[in-house]
Every structure is written in C-alpha cells, then in structure tokens.
C-alpha cells in the first residue's frame, strides 16, 4: 500500500472484530461473499449461521473504502429470484451499490482435495447457466444497484 499498490481482500466476513479492525482500514476494496440471507440455509450450507456475518458486514462497510457483495449462485441454495431480491435489499441496507452474481461451478473441488477435506456441496449440483444468472442480475438492477455476472 505504501508503494502505491491497490489492495483488495475477499472475505466471508466471518471473523473477529480484531481481525476486521486490523485489516480493513488498509484495503482499497473488500469483496464480500453473501451465500444466503436466510440464517438456516446459510448454516446448512456453510456450517455457521449468518448472524455474525451480517453484523460484521455492517462494521466492514463503515471502515472500508469500497465494498462489493459477491454472490456465489448455487442451484438448490440461493438461485431463486426471491433470494436475490433479499440480497439486493441487504446490500442497499449496508450502503453497498454493487453486487456480483457468480455462477456456481465445481472448480473448488480440487482445493478441498488438496486440503484433505470432503467436498460437501455434492457432485450432483450443476453449473448455473448464463441465462439464469442474467435473470438474477436483472433482479439486482431493479433495486437500483450495479450488477455484473462474474467479476
């Protein structure tokens, strides 16, 4: 940063206050995941409720220079128009103006294998077609936010 480099961090926002306060002030861009607005769905998919994440997200946007919410769009989990309406409202409530729709893919499987962990998303989940991702982009745009597929 001192040498003029732009800095960014990608986070789930599931961390301690100390970590947020130690890192976020020095970052130009925070790319923050949002897997589900529903605490039960989030817990089923990730193993933790999103309550702490939502609180941390509010802290992060107060400290960060810029935040973009990124939605790994997973069929059977959050690939529903209603959920994208809720995500857009969540982004607006935080003062975040940009959402990235990230179509689900299975490229993360190899990371799990390298770490010796089980890939719990399941092999039966298929990648999200681009035209479906475009529907979700249009939902976010309808809330007056910026939105791209990918990012």
Q: Where are the language model's segments positioned?
A:
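Conserved AdoMet/S-adenosylmethionine-binding subsite of the radical SAM
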Residues: 1-108, 113-114
